[in-house]
UniProtKB/Swiss-Prot annotation:
Any GO BP: photosynthesis
Subcellular localization, as worded in the UniProt entry: Cellular thylakoid membrane
Pfam family, one: PsaL
Family designation: Belongs to the PsaL family.
Keywords: Membrane, Photosynthesis, Photosystem I, Thylakoid, Transmembrane, Transmembrane helix
The protein's name: Photosystem I reaction center subunit XI
Species classification: Bacteria, Bacillati, Cyanobacteriota, Cyanophyceae, Synechococcales
Length: 199
């Protein structure tokens, strides 16, 4: 013990706590609500990866592990195909309903082209992530994903994911365009367009 530590220890040993502020109902061995919900480290505490009730809860783990990016037993190409189809399908609606041509007769086609353009931009970003230099970052196991896909985080796996994402994104946009173009939605489309242009 250094001289500073000794002097500090001696100076603080005379400190007395006021008895009215001491809570005797809490004992060191009690396991209360705070202990049950305490945040624990997953692996190395210096990394800052913590197991909280949110990221290590049953619902969160089941939801995240069933997404196509983390689901076990599928190829990187199919992961990209499924992820891209969801992106393309979901991007079509906002581009069609809130785009600059929403009140014209070309709204459906403009939404399709805008969604496909957004899928192309996202695909270009995925290609840049796999650009020469550093290999894609391999995610270590954590509190939410116990077994991340190892075949995805290689150059070939990421390239397969990217090509599947492009194909799925374009296909999802075209599928949404075909669904909106059906006859039974012709009566609903003017109502939806009037909601967005009411302001």
């Amino acid at each position: 013990m250094s001289d500073f530590q000794k002097s500090f220890s001696e100076s603080t040993s005379s400190i007395k706590f006021d008895e009215k502020y001491i809570d005797n109902s809490v004992q060191p061995n009690d396991i209360g609500v705070a202990e049950q919900w305490a945040v624990k480290t997953v692996a190395d505490p210096c990394v800052g990866n913590l197991a909280t009730p949110v990221n290590s809860g049953y619902f969160t783990k089941a939801f995240i592990n069933n997404l196509p990016f983390y689901r076990e037993g599928i190829s990187p190409n199919f992961r990209g195909l499924e992820t891209g189809a969801a992106f393309g399908y979901l991007l079509y609606g906002p581009f069609t309903m809130t785009g600059p041509l929403r009140n014209s007769e070309f709204a459906l086609t403009a939404g399709l082209l805008a969604a496909i353009g957004a899928v192309h931009i996202l695909t270009a970003l995925l290609v840049l992530y796999n650009a020469p230099g550093k290999a894609p970052n391999v995610q270590p196991p954590d509190a939410t994903v116990n077994n991340p896909p190892k075949d995805l985080f290689t150059r070939a796996g990421w390239a397969d994911f990217t090509s599947g994402f492009w194909l799925g994104g374009c296909g999802g946009s075209v599928f949404a365009w075909l669904l909106v173009g059906t006859l039974h939605l012709d009566t609903i489309m003017p109502i939806i367009k009037n909601i967005w242009t009411a302001g």
